[in-house]
Amino acid sequence: MATARRRKIVAGNWKMNKSVPEALALVRDLRGQVASLGDTVEVVVAPPFVALQPLHVALEGAPLALAAQNCHWESSGAFTGEISAPMLAELGCAYVIVGHSERRQLFGDTDEQVNKRAKAVRAAGMTPIICVGETLAEREANQTLAVVERQVRGALEGFGAKEVAGFVLAYEPVWAIGTGRNATAAQAQEVHAAIRGLVERLYDGETAGRVRIQYGGSVKPDNAAELLGQPDVDGALVGGASLKAGDFAAIVKAAT
């Protein structure tokens, strides 16, 4: 497999948290804490939809990229309550999270729908952060790698090597999200290496060497350095800890 120096990417998924004033205060604080890092780590924040436009304005010139937490696969139409990828691009989003376990578990997102969302994101000129991961029952049944492979294959269906090389994949074991439990560094590395190996089989070594794979699942300041120190862990998708500027900044610094 071709080797590549991959720039770490740390993204904060705020989920359904923070009012617009709270969101503005958080990024103002965060901006000050990560400014000294320069461009060594790519930092991304994914606030609720209502905060995207205000944050786009507030983040002008800042070393912080904006992400949305989901999108519909159609560009427009009679889809009450949905938001399209082109709309998100207009708001300054560089990334869109697709396939998050909460979307799969709570809203029934399928591998096919994740693929359609990813294609819409790409068509709108943004980069998908494609989430995959197993439940506790699947891990205990030794199905982790099979489940993750199915999800990765489904999400990448129809994409070419050059596109995939620029994507971000995120391994987030469902049993570790919001539970306080997290995969060990060795467990994370095993799955990340398997994902990279799958990308090599599906495409080629260069693509596998360039695609970035984040770990998500109870990432905190006290475990970030060990997780991010693994050779195939290229960053973190952070939930609860991203709601506190100090905690999130500490995770970002652990990625340097």
Swiss-Prot record:
Molecular function in Gene Ontology: triose-phosphate isomerase activity
Pathway field: Carbohydrate biosynthesis; gluconeogenesis; Carbohydrate degradation; glycolysis; D-glyceraldehyde 3-phosphate from glycerone phosphate: step 1/1
Binding site for substrate: N13, W14, K15, G178, S218, G239, G240
Pfam families referenced in this protein's UniProt entry, alphabetically: TIM
Keyword Isomerase: yes
Positions annotated as active site in the UniProt record: H100, E172
Alphabetical keyword list: Cytoplasm, Gluconeogenesis, Glycolysis, Isomerase
Source organism superkingdom: Bacteria
Alphabetical list of SUPFAM superfamilies matching this protein: Triosephosphate isomerase (TIM) (SSF51351)
Keyword Isomerase appears in the UniProt entry: yes
Protein localization: Cytoplasm
A GO cellular component annotation in the UniProt record: cytosol
Primary location group: cytoplasm
InterPro entries, A to Z: Aldolase_TIM (IPR013785), TIM_sf (IPR035990), TrioseP_Isoase_bac/euk (IPR022896), Triosephosphate_isomerase (IPR000652), Triosephosphate_isomerase_AS (IPR020861)
Reaction catalysis annotation: D-glyceraldehyde 3-phosphate = dihydroxyacetone phosphate
Listed EC numbers: 5.3.1.1
An individual GO BP term: gluconeogenesis
Known role: Involved in the gluconeogenesis. Catalyzes stereospecifically the conversion of dihydroxyacetone phosphate (DHAP) to D-glyceraldehyde-3-phosphate (G3P).
Family the entry assigns: Belongs to the triosephosphate isomerase family.
NCBIfam families, alphabetized: tim (TIGR00419)
Assembly and interaction partners: Homodimer.
UniProt protein name: Triosephosphate isomerase
Organism the protein comes from: Myxococcus xanthus (strain DK1622)
Taxonomic lineage of the native organism: Bacteria, Pseudomonadati, Myxococcota, Myxococcia, Myxococcales
